Amino acid sequence: MKFLHTADWHIGKKLHGFDLLAEQREAFKQILAIAKEEQVDAVVIAGDLYDRSVPAVEAVEIFNEMMIQMNLKEHFPVLAISGNHDSSTRLETGGPWFNQTQFYLNTRLEQAFQPIEIDNTQFYLLPYFEPIAARLYFE
């Protein structure tokens, strides 16, 4: 199995007031080109999809466009986790629908113990969590 591991997309990031959305779109095109060229079986996004927990509307729209292209049009399964900059509650709102399209997004610790299987390979997606969440989960 071949997969492309990415992380820290930080969609919506501004650098000293300069909007990076155009650069982020270009980076996504490069990620998609690599996925196609290498004929990967899945794309991993290991946290920090957005730059802040309440991203700007434009950042959400751009990320949606990216996932429609990668997952629905190009048919790459996407394995993603929330990072410390993401709001797990906001990200998980489409969870049941996402899984039907092979867009797997884990945002809570308890989800990490349920494997996602692609081509007889199991993935365990461990999202960012606060230490208190682990203590409460394992008590």
Mark where each language-model region is.
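Active-site-proximal cofactor/substrate-binding loop regions of enzyme domains
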Residues: D41, V78, E117
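Short phosphate-binding/catalytic loops that engage adenosine nucleotides
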Residues: H75-F76, F103
